[in-house]
Every structure is written in structure tokens, then in C-alpha cells.
């Protein structure tokens, strides 16, 4: 099975999701600590070894006007690090509105009794799933400057 990873890059946490190309679905699997711009590479390495993704999709934070913002630089740097470390194609995609969709999904899961308030950290993983699903279904376009091995 070919799968892809999606990432929601943040200054403190990086949400990670895994997606299936056949079903165009994704699910959050982790929220990785990010300290001073340095991700927990050991945890990321373990996830990669367990899932063996063939493509990495990183959300690129943009303003509502579609312009890059200060957070875009961190996401681009992270995408470049992923490309160098894993020698896999890395795609940058527009992540506007993904956090709101992730929060909506999390609230629905809480209302259904599937999530607890203390699971709130998983919103980052859910945001990564939203980013990845958008790419898998072709709803989000790759942004210029995507890294490739």
C-alpha cells in the first residue's frame, strides 16, 4: 500500500497524519514536539519506519490573501529538512482554514464521546489529516518551492 504523511508544522508541536491514496483518507497519528525549530527526529524516524510513506505533504501557512507569512518560513525550513533527511518527495500545500476544520472535527468527536478534553493536543494531528486529505483528493494545490529529492 502506498501511503503519504501529512504535517501541520507549528512552533511547539508538529501534527502528523498518515493517508491512504486509494481511499483518499487520512488520520492523525501523532503530535511531535518541536523545540526551537528542532523536531523530535527520533519520534519522526520511528513513525517513518513503521509506516514507510512515499510522499511527505507539509502545510504552508498563508494569509487569507494567499501571501506567505512569518510562520511560512518555519514550514519551508521543515519541508527542506524532511527532504534532506528522508530523500522523499516533499510537497508544500496551502493550509488555510485547516485548523478551523480540525477544531470542528475534534468538537464533533468530543460530543460523540470519542475524544476527551485532555486529548486537545491531537488537534494538531487532526489538522495534519485535513491538510493531507486536501492533497489526496486534489482539493489543494502544491505551492511553488516544494522540495524534491
Features from the language model and the residues they span:
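Phosphate- and other anionic-substrate recognition elements at nucleic-acid/protein interfaces
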Residues: 2-7, 11-149
Amino acid at each position: 500500500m502506498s501511503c503519504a504523511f501529512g504535517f501541520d508544522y507549528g512552533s511547539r508541536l508538529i501534527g502528523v497524519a498518515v493517508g491512504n491514496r486509494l481511499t483518499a483518507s487520512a488520520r492523525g497519528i501523532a503530535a511531535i514536539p518541536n523545540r526551537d525549530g528542532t523536531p523530535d527526529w527520533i519520534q519522526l524516524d520511528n513513525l517513518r519506519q513503521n509506516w514507510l510513506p512515499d510522499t511527505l505533504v507539509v502545510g504552508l501557512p498563508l494569509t487569507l490573501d494567499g501571501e506567505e507569512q512569518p510562520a511560512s518560513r518555519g514550514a519551508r525550513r521543515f519541508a527542506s529538512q524532511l527532504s534532506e533527511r528522508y530523500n522523499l518527495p516533499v510537497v508544500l500545500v496551502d493550509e488555510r482554514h485547516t485548523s478551523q476544520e480540525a477544531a470542528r472535527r475534534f468538537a464533533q468527536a468530543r460530543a460523540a464521546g470519542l475524544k476527551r478534553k485532555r486529548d486537545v493536543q491531537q488537534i494538531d494531528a487532526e489538522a495534519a489529516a485535513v491538510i493531507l486529505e486536501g492533497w489526496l483528493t486534489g482539493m489543494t494545490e502544491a505551492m511553488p518551492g516544494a522540495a524534491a529529492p
